[in-house]
A protein has these predicted regions:
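N-terminal cationic-hydrophobic initiation segments that often serve targeting/anchoring roles
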Residues: 61, 154, 228, 269, ...
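Active-site diphosphate/adenylate-binding microenvironment
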Residues: 6-18, 24-27, 32-37, 340-421, ...
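Phosphate/pyrophosphate-binding active-site segments
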Residues: 138, 294-380, 490-547
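Active-site/binding-pocket entry motifs
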Residues: 103, 169, 380-382, 528
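Conserved thiamine diphosphate
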Residues: 63, 114-156, 271, 335-347, ...
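Thiamine diphosphate
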Residues: 97, 107-118, 258, 310, ...
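Short conserved AdoMet
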Residues: 155-156, 202, 369, 390, ...
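N-terminal alpha/beta PP-like core and its mobile active-site loop of ThDP/TPP-dependent enzymes
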Residues: 1-330, 370, 449-452
């Protein structure tokens, strides 16, 4: 069967579950976009800029398992670099497709627009090499091998890939000789690794599991819970990877964030003689500036492409195989451990005093429903939200490793489009919102219905807590935030609110509950120096780390 290369590429993406494609049109991808919009199984979601498109693709992939975006050559693909780098850091598979000049133009080294004017056409692909797990230059001859290869790599590594697609190649017909198939996973024998772990557990008095974001990336929640249920080893999770473990499990202890953790959890983890680090990375923000008290060299590192125990290191083993091996261990822990204490309902007073961060998050705890997706911006929102108690079927999205402010607004666009039937709660601050605010326009056009909470506390609170509490560079221009939906054409679609007190907030939450078929935009005013308790401590840790 004859198909254009662009059609074949979209067939492959559809086969792995992609039904939305994000991006921005440009002259080197326009005829390729014709092939996208002509399909019934794919929807083109045009974004206001490529950065927002990359963030939206990331949010979509965190629910769907993979995403695709399209940019034009040079100016478009470089605008997406920040978002793609974040997806690489946090292991989110995004297929970044760049529509490029024709092969004839490239081979002749012509000084084409959107180039650097040097006659080279591999500069941007080289820039992507460090932030994608693999790259491909598509031709009619290699399309049926290269396209499946890079999609398979994205899914196996849970990281972005880059596809360079000259526009004449996208329009060229090829004879499709085989159906699309993902490359098979080559399983490794991990029996030696498991024997080492078993010996450590058998000699341990106080074992513990620290888990994190790779469990979310690889979708290994059931496998991890099976291992924990069989062995009775307690689990602490990092903020980097919130939702990796079922917080309703009797073996869940809570969030471990170094010196900031509850004393019982902190003492148990720090004094453990057998720490299994499963799918987690002990970053500065996740551990309050590396404030853990255990010896990092004694930790058993069980990560994708990284098994480390004592002097043994293996970088050619998958997290999937390692967790499958753990589930074959015949071990049961009999040591008692601190149990997670879920917060009490309605643990706050309603009054007409200015709303505080503490009360805001307590009220948010009561507001969360079983199936909600909670998206927390890297700022006051994240550092308050990662202590929220999740239900088993909640989904939590943050970006604490890459930490690019503004990420969550377009990411919410992506996550809501990935599953329109789940309520999305976005918690974001004013400074972050100003970076990517145009995503509201796309949300309105796509007629999605997230609930957006904007903390208006007049500036960059995280930065204030690190340095320059009253410095003018941490100030931002005050906007009338509740008018933004009207500016972006959503006056009739979006319910807007202005909140100053807990009494007002409670009334708004009840109105939101009563209108699930509407998008809601809530501006929540708070004091400029108010912050979640843990953010105050993290700020001090970062200030110390920076010298």
């Amino acid at each position: 069967m004859k198909k254009r290369v662009g059609q074949y590429l979209m067939d492959c993406l559809s086969n792995v579950g992609v039904d939305k494609v994000f991006g921005v049109p440009g002259d080197f991808n326009l005829t390729f976009l014709d092939d996208i919009i002509s399909r019934d199984d794919l929807e083109w979601v045009g974004n206001t800029n490529e950065l927002n498109a990359s963030y939206a693709a990331d949010g979509y992939a965190r629910l769907k398992g993979i995403a695709a975006m399209v940019t034009t050559f040079g100016v478009g693909e470089l605008s997406a670099v920040n978002g793609i780098a974040g997806s690489y850091a946090e292991r989110v598979p995004v297929i970044q497709i760049t529509g490029a000049p024709t092969r004839a133009v490239e081979q002749a080294g012509k000084y084409v627009h959107h180039s650097l004017g040097e006659g080279r056409f591999d500069d941007y692909r080289n820039m992507y090499a460090s932030i994608t797990t693999t790259q491909a230059y598509i031709t009619p001859e290699n399309a049926q091998s290269e396209i499946p290869r890079v999609i398979s790599a994205a899914l196996f590594e849970k990281r972005p890939v880059h596809i360079h697609l000259p526009i004449d190649v996208a329009n060229t017909e090829i004879e499709v000789t085989s159906s699309f198939e993902l490359a098979g996973h080559q399983h490794r024998d991990v029996s030696k690794h498991m024997q080492m772990i078993m010996e450590k557990l058998q000699s341990a008095d106080q074992p513990v599991i620290i888990t994190g974001h790779e469990i979310n990336s690889f979708g290994l929640h059931e496998e991890l819970e099976k291992f924990v249920t069989q062995t009775h080893i307690p689990v602490a999770q990092l903020s980097l990877g919130k939702g990796a473990f079922n917080e309703e499990s009797p073996y869940y202890m809570g969030v471990y964030d170094g010196a900031l953790a509850d004393k019982a959890i902190r003492d148990y983890v720090d004094q453990s003689d057998a720490i299994l680090n499963i799918g987690a990375k002990l970053t500065d923000s996740a551990t309050a500036g590396y404030s853990y008290q255990f010896d990092i060299d004694d930790v058993v590192m069980i990560n994708h492409h990284n098994f480390k125990m004592n002097e043994t290191k293996d970088t050619d083993v998958s997290l999937v195989d390692l967790l499958a091996g753990l589930n074959k261990l015949n071990y049961v822990n009999h040591m008692d451990f601190p149990k997670y204490q879920r917060p009490s309902a309605h643990d706050y007073d309603l009054n007409d005093d200015p709303l505080t961060q503490e009360t805001y998050f307590k009220m948010m705890q009561d507001f969360i429903k079983e199936e909600d997706v909670i998206i927390a911006e890297q700022g006051t929102s994240f550092f308050g939200a990662y202590d929220l108690a999740l239900n088993q079927h909640n989904k939590f999205i943050g970006q604490p490793l890459w930490g690019s402010i503004g990420y969550t607004l377009p990411a919410t666009l992506g996550s809501q489009l990935a599953d329109p039937n789940r309520r999305n709660l976005l918690l974001i601050g004013d400074g972050s919102l100003q970076l990517t605010v145009q995503a509201i326009s796309t949300m309105i056009r796509e007629e999605i219905k997230p609930v957006i909470f904007v903390i208006n506390n007049d500036g960059y609170t995280v930065e204030r807590k690190i340095h320059g509490e009253n410095a003018m560079y941490n100030d931002i221009k005050m906007w009338d935030y509740k008018l933004l939906p009207t500016v972006f054409g959503g006056k009739e679609q979006v319910c807007t609110y202005d909140v100053n007190t807990s009494e007002e907030f409670q009334k708004v939450l009840l109105q939101v509950e009563a209108q699930p078929d509407r998008m809601h935009f809530i501006e929540v005013k708070m004091d400029v120096h108010d912050a979640p308790q843990k953010l105050n401590a993290i700020g001090q840790a970062f200030a110390k780390q920076n010298g």
